[in-house]
């Protein structure tokens, strides 16, 4: 629900209130009941035993789903070949560094001008602690990880029409919202209005918990004092010497927090998917894709654009165009095919599958997303504002500003995620702009939160996923209705072809979904082979 709309509470806003008032555990339980959260189904390395009968498998796509399939099938004894559109492994597991050149639809070319050591992840950028398959493959492939700072209490929440447009610290909004809610609950408890819900013996325990949870005083009131300051910070912090005494800051009235609607953003940290600990590969997310590719050796044929997929009772024939010889159409045959091409692309390729799978492929639209990386002369967010990692949220079209979790407290340049726009009108509006204009707008909007932007900005790159040639969108965007009707048909083996990828999972847009989908697909394919 957008600011200024009618006061109808959506499912997401209901979850936000549950999470901010009752805490992340309560929110996770609510999300699970609504089908929005679950632990990874990964149970450890897959075991494909039995006679593979010298079978061959063609894998289409060298993203994480495709490379997972290729590695596991080769280990089981299959003859494996991989065709990949790009000239690099990883698919959406992608990192841009200085010197990289990327051309999107519309022939807009961007050359990344980042300084040495700086990078930007246009696709996935974080790994939850419970995405066990991704973490296990990182361990097995020796991909070094470091913490990704999701929640930084010193980062900012911003609403253009609230507090005179001034951003507020997350800790201030969170602490004051919690304290005011605790005071209200304590008040109705002492007035006996919860007697039907709370036993007499539990009443005092509830009041004690509210006092502790909300930093209330002896009268169960939330107000500005040094006890409150221990949670929300100080107007003047404790120091040493004659001027050492701390001074508490003023609290924000509940009415102002509610009116600002900044409480909405607190759910982003309570949601199970975003709870600490989060991880990132040291040096960029593509370290995962590169590690897979090293393990695979020469299995991957890069620069291969698939133009036709045919099958009969004896096998699969795929036609493709090699970027080194674009005038010629080449073919490759195999007994089986694991296809991980995004549905947004696959729906445009002639494909010999049954009507049910074809309908499923055509039924899934892809989400629009825009991510913009901005390099600055210095890490002003650290030096001026003591923001080390984390994410700030805003109602401006850029939606998010994320601060790097690597190279903390170092001098020199730094790269921010200057915008992460997922779905909604702003995502499509930014995608329609040339990259230079996207960057200019991100700098303009960001300067309303960090005034240092315009003086410190150097260069940037802007990725609009609907204009990315190899995906034409960010990720599969299932509706509940489409999933109920088409999901099983999408995942079933059709003759000698099986699909895999984040779109064939209940974790769309996450690398975990891609890997789990792939493991499930190759396990079922292998079972069919050994039983033939």
Residue positions per predicted region:
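Active-site/ligand-binding neighborhood in enzyme catalytic cores
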Residues: 154, 161-162, 185-305, 313-315, ...
């Amino acid at each position: 629900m957008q600011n200024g709309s009618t006061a109808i509470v959506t499912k997401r806003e209901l979850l936000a209130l549950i999470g901010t008032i009752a805490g992340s555990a309560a929110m996770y339980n609510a999300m699970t009941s609504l089908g929005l959260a679950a632990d990874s189904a990964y149970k450890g390395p897959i075991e494909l035993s039995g006679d593979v009968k010298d079978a061959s498998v063609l894998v289409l796509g060298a993203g994480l789903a495709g490379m997972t399939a290729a590695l596991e099938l080769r280990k089981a004894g299959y003859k494996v070949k991989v065709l990949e559109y790009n000239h690099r492994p990883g698919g959406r597991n992608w990192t841009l560094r200085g010197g990289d050149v990327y051309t999107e639809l519309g022939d807009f070319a961007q050359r990344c001008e980042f300084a040495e050591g700086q990078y930007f992840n246009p696709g996935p950028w974080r790994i939850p602690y419970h995405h066990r398959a991704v973490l296990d493959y990182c361990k097995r492939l020796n991909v070094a990880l470091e913490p990704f700072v999701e929640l930084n209490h010193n980062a900012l929440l911003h609403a253009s029409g609230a507090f005179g447009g001034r951003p507020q610290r997350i800790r201030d909004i969170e602490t004051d919202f919690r304290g005011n809610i605790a005071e209200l609950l304590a008040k109705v408890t002492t007035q006996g209005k919860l007697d039907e819900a709370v036993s007499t013996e539990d009443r005092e325990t509830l009041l004690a918990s509210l006092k502790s949870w909300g930093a209330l005083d002896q009268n169960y009131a939330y107000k500005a004092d040094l006890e409150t300051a221990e949670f929300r910070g100080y107007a003047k912090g404790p120091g040493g010497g004659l001027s050492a005494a701390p001074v508490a800051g003023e609290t924000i009235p509940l009415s102002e927090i509610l009116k600002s609607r900044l409480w909405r953003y607190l759910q982003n940290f309570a949601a199970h998917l975003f709870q600490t600990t989060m991880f990132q590969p040291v040096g960029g997310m593509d370290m995962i894709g590169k590690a897979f590719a090293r393990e695979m050796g020469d299995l991957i044929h890069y620069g291969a654009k698939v133009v036709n997929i045919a099958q009969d009772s004896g096998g699969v024939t795929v036609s493709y165009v090699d970027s080194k010889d674009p005038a010629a159409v080449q073919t490759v045959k195999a007994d089986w095919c694991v296809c991980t091409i995004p549905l947004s692309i696959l729906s445009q390729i002639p494909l010999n599958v049954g009507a049910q799978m074809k309908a499923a492929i055509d039924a899934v639209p892809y989400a629009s997303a825009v991510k913009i990386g901005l390099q600055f002369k210095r890490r002003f967010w650290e030096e001026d504002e003591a923001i080390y990692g984390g994410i700030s949220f805003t109602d401006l079209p850029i939606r998010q500003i994320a601060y790097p979790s690597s190279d903390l407290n170092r001098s020199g340049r730094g790269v921010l995620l200057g915008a992460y726009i997922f779905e909604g009108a702003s995502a499509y509006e930014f995608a329609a702009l040339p990259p230079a204009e996207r960057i200019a707008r991100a700098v303009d909007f960001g300067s309303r939160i960090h005034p240092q932007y315009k003086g410190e900005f150097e260069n940037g790159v802007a990725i609009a996923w609907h204009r990315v040639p190899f995906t034409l969108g960010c990720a599969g965007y299932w509706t509940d209705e489409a999933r109920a009707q088409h999901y099983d048909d999408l995942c079933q083996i059709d003759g000698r072809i099986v699909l895999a990828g984040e779109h064939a999972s209940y974790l769309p847009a996450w690398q975990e979904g891609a890997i789990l989908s792939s493991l499930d697909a190759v396990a079922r394919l292998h079972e069919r082979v050994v039983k033939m």
